[in-house]
C-alpha cells in the first residue's frame, strides 16, 4: 500500500534536479530547473538560497565529510564551467547556519566538473576537460580532442603537499600527514547516565571540522599521473580514489555499425600509499559509495553489484556472475512489486503535464491555458484501461500545444513475443507459370560490410536476379508457402537455400547463407548507389551526389563518405529528402561554406585545393515534406547562406527543441 510522507516541506519553485543529504547534519541541498542552489534545513523547515546561475543549471553538489562545506559545478559561460565552494558555517548540531559567499576555486580551461571531497579533508578531487592533445583524422585533414579529460585534485590546506611525490617517513608511519583540524572549545564531560548508554547510540564517528585555505587555492591544483581520456566519475575513499573511464569508440553501435564492442566503462582505483593505479571492475556504468566509504555499489547494464570499496576483486569472483554474498551480485529476480496502475497512471499523467509546464520553451505555452488543458484530460483518467491508452491520453494533451518534438515513448508495456524473420536482402515474387519464387532484385549494398549487403552476394554463391528459390532449410516453397514463413526465427542464422538458374539443366544447387536481422541499411545503400549512378550518367561524371539520412551519427557519416570523395566535382547535389533530424547541421554547413583560396601545385601529379577538401563547383539541395527538425534548419540555413538552389517541397517545419533526459516512474 502507498504511504503518505511523514513530513512535507515548502520547496523552491521549479523542478528539483538533484538532491544531496549532508553526512553530519539534517540538511539537504537542492538544485533546481530555475538554475538555483538551495539548502533545506530539515530541522527548521527553512530554505536558504546559496547560489544561482544565469547560464545553465548548477550541478554536482557534494558535502564535505564534516558537512560544513559544499562544492558544486557552475557555468561561467556557455563554454566554461568551474568548481565553487560555499562555507555553510553550521553550529555543532547543524540547526543554525550562516552560509558564506560562493567562492570559485578552479580556473577552467574548458569544463571542470564532478567535485568530491577526500574523506580525510586533505584534497578536493574533480574532473576537468583541459588537455588539448590532437588526434589526427585518418580520412580528412583535421583533428579532434576526444581524450581531453583527466582527474585532478586541489590541496585544501597550504601545508598539504602533492600526494604523488613520495615523502620521507619512518617505517610504519603514514606517508601523508593528517589534515589540519580547526580547534574547538572543549565540550562538557558526559554524565553518568550517558556513560552507561551504548556508545553507538550516543556518539557518531568523530570527524574533525574541516579547514580550507581559500587564498591561492586555484594554484594548488595537481593532476593525476594517468593518461587523458573520457573520465566520468571521481570518488574519494580513505587513502584511495576511484574514477571511471569510458572507452573511446565510434558513435554508431549495434548490427551494421562500426562499433560492436562493449561500450561500458572501467573502474580504476588509485592507492596513495602504494602509489599504484589498477582496474577494479570492467563494464561499469555508474558507481556509488556509502557515507563511510567502506562499501561501493556499481551498475552494469541491468545488474547491480555491491563490494568492499577500493578492494581488488579476486579473479575467481570477478568471473563469477552468479548472485551471492560472495560475488556481490544482487539477485534482482527476487524483487517483487505490487502496482496500483490507476494511481501510477494518474501520477505519470500529472508529471508529464508538469514537465511541459516547467520546460516548454516559452512561459506563455504559446497562449494555451495549461491548467484548463489539465482539467480537460484529467477527467478521462478514470476511463483508461491500459498502458497504451495512457500514452494516447498524454499525446492528445501534449498535442494541444501545437508544437513539434512533444514525445512520450517506452514504458512498462507487457512483453509481446517476437518472431524475427531472417532477411535475404532481396525482392522475391511468386510466378505461377514457373511455379517458383523468383529473385526479382538482389540488394548488394556494401559487400565489404558484413551486415549491410545481401547474403546472396557473398563470394561463391553466384545467385543472380531471375534465379529461382526452391527450398529453405530443405522445405519446399510453393504458391501457398512463402519464403517469409520458412524464415521465421531464422534472423541472423545460417540457413540452407536451394537455388536454380532457369534454362540450365541440373542447375539446382544448395548454398548456405547467414540471414540479416535487418535489411534496411542494405536497401538504403542500393538506393543511394542508384541515385549516384543516375547523376553521374546524366552529367558524364561532372556532378556528384550524396544523401544525408539524418542530422545525427548516421547522417554525418554519410555526408563525409559522399562529400570527401566528390568534393572536386564541378557540381554536387545534396539530397536531404526524408532527413530525420538531429543536431549536426552546423558541422555540415561549415564544410559547405569553405571555398578554394588557392592550390598546392606539385611538379608531378594533380594540383590540390587550399584549404584542403573545399568545393570548387555549384551546389543544389533537394528536400521534401518529410525533411524535419534539424533537416528543417539545414534547409533554411542553406537558403539563407545562398549556397545554391533548393529544389523540392516545403519541409516539415518542426524546430522546437527536445530534452529527453526525463523519465516517468515506469521508465517512460
Can you annotate each of these PLM segments?
Residues 4-8, 208-227:
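A short helix->beta-strand "capping" segment at the edge of beta-propeller domains
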Residues 404-451, 536-537:
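PDZ/PDZ-like peptide-tail recognition elements
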Residues 359, 446-456, 470, 475-667:
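Cleft-lining beta-strand/loop regions that shape enzyme active-site pockets
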Residues 1, 194-217:
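Blade/loop signatures of beta-propeller domains
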Residues 1-16, 23-44, 51-58, 65-84, ...:
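A flexible loop/linker signature enriched in serine peptidases of the S9 family
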Residues 24-26, 66-68, 120-122, 239, ...:
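Short coil/turn segments that connect the beta-strands within blades of beta-propeller domains
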Amino acid at each position: 500500500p502507498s504511504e503518505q510522507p511523514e513530513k512535507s516541506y515548502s520547496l523552491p519553485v521549479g523542478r528539483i534536479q538533484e538532491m544531496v543529504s549532508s553526512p553530519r547534519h539534517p540538511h539537504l541541498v537542492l538544485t533546481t530547473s530555475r538554475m538555483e542552489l538551495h539548502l533545506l534545513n530539515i530541522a527548521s523547515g527553512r530554505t536558504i538560497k546559496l547560489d544561482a546561475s544565469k547560464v545553465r543549471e548548477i550541478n554536482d553538489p557534494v558535502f564535505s565529510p564534516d558537512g560544513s562545506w559544499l562544492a558544486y559545478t557552475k557555468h561561467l559561460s556557455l563554454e566554461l564551467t568551474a568548481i565553487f565552494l560555499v562555507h555553510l558555517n553550521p553550529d555543532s548540531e547543524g540547526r543554525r547556519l550562516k552560509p558564506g559567499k560562493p567562492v570559485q576555486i578552479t580556473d577552467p580551461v574548458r569544463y571542470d566538473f564532478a567535485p568530491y571531497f577526500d574523506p580525510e579533508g586533505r584534497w578536493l578531487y574533480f574532473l576537468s576537460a583541459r588537455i588539448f592533445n590532437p588526434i589526427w583524422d585518418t580520412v580528412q585533414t583535421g583533428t579532434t580532442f576526444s581524450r581531453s579529460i583527466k582527474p585532478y585534485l586541489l590541496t585544501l590546506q597550504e601545508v598539504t603537499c602533492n600526494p604523488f611525490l613520495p615523502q620521507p617517513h619512518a617505517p610504519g608511519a603514514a606517508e601523508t600527514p593528517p589534515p589540519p583540524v580547526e580547534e574547538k572549545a572543549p565540550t562538557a564531560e558526559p554524565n553518568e547516565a550517558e556513560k552507561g548508554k551504548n556508545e553507538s547510540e550516543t556518539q557518531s564517528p568523530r570527524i574533525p571540522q574541516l579547514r580550507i585555505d581559500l587564498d591561492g587555492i586555484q594554484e594548488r591544483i595537481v593532476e593525476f599521473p594517468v593518461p587523458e581520456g573520457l573520465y566520468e566519475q571521481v570518488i574519494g575513499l580513505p587513502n584511495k580514489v576511484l574514477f571511471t573511464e569510458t572507452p573511446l569508440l565510434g558513435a554508431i553501435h549495434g548490427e551494421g555499425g562500426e562499433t560492436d564492442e562493449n561500450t561500458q566503462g572501467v573502474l580504476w582505483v588509485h592507492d596513495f600509499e602504494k602509489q599504484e593505479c589498477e582496474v577494479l571492475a570492467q563494464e561499469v556504468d555508474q558507481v556509488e559509495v556509502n557515507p563511510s566509504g567502506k562499501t561501493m555499489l556499481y551498475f552494469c547494464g541491468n545488474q547491480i553489484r555491491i563490494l568492499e570499496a577500493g578492494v581488488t576483486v579476486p579473479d575467481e569472483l570477478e568471473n563469477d556472475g552468479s548472485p551471492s554474498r560472495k560475488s556481490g551480485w544482487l539477485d534482482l529476480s527476487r524483487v517483487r512489486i505490487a502496482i496500483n496502475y490507476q494511481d501510477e497512471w494518474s501520477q505519470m499523467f500529472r508529471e508529464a503535464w508538469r514537465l511541459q509546464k516547467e520546460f516548454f520553451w516559452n512561459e506563455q505555452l504559446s497562449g494555451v491555458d495549461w491548467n484548463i488543458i489539465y482539467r480537460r484530460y484529467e477527467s478521462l483518467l478514470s476511463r483508461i484501461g491500459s498502458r497504451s491508452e495512457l500514452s494516447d491520453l498524454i499525446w492528445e494533451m501534449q498535442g494541444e500545444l501545437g508544437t513539434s518534438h512533444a514525445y512520450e515513448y517506452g514504458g512498462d508495456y507487457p512483453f509481446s513475443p517476437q518472431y524475427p524473420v531472417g532477411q535475404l536482402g532481396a525482392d522475391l515474387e511468386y510466378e505461377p507459370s514457373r511455379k517458383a519464387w523468383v529473385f526479382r532484385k538482389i540488394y548488394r549494398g556494401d559487400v565489404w560490410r558484413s551486415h549491410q549487403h545481401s547474403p546472396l552476394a557473398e563470394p561463391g554463391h553466384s545467385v543472380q536476379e531471375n534465379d529461382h528459390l526452391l527450398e529453405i532449410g530443405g522445405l519446399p516453397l510453393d504458391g501457398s508457402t512463402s519464403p517469409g514463413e520458412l524464415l521465421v526465427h531464422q534472423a541472423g542464422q545460417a540457413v540452407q537455400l536451394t537455388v536454380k538458374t532457369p534454362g540450365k539443366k541440373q542447375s539446382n544447387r544448395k548454398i548456405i547463407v547467414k540471414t540479416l536481422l535487418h535489411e534496411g541499411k542494405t536497401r538504403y545503400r542500393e538506393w543511394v548507389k542508384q541515385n549516384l549512378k543516375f547523376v553521374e550518367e546524366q552529367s558524364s561524371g561532372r556532378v556528384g551526389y550524396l544523401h544525408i539520412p539524418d542530422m545525427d551519427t548516421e547522417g554525418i557519416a554519410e555526408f563525409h563518405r559522399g562529400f570527401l570523395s566528390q568534393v572536386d566535382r564541378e557540381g554536387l547535389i545534396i539530397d536531404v529528402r526524408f532527413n530525420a533530424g538531429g543536431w549536426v547541421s552546423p558541422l555540415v554547413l561549415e564544410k559547405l561554406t569553405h571555398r578554394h583560396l588557392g592550390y598546392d601545385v606539385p611538379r608531378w601529379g594533380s594540383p590540390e585545393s587550399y584549404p584542403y577538401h573545399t568545393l570548387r563547383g555549384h551546389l543544389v539541395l533537394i528536400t521534401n515534406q518529410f525533411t524535419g527538425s534539424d533537416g528543417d534548419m539545414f534547409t533554411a540555413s542553406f537558403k539563407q547562406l545562398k549556397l545554391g538552389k533548393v529544389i523540392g517541397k516545403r519541409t516539415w517545419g518542426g524546430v522546437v527543441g527536445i530534452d529527453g533526459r526525463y523519465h516517468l516512474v515506469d521508465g517512460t
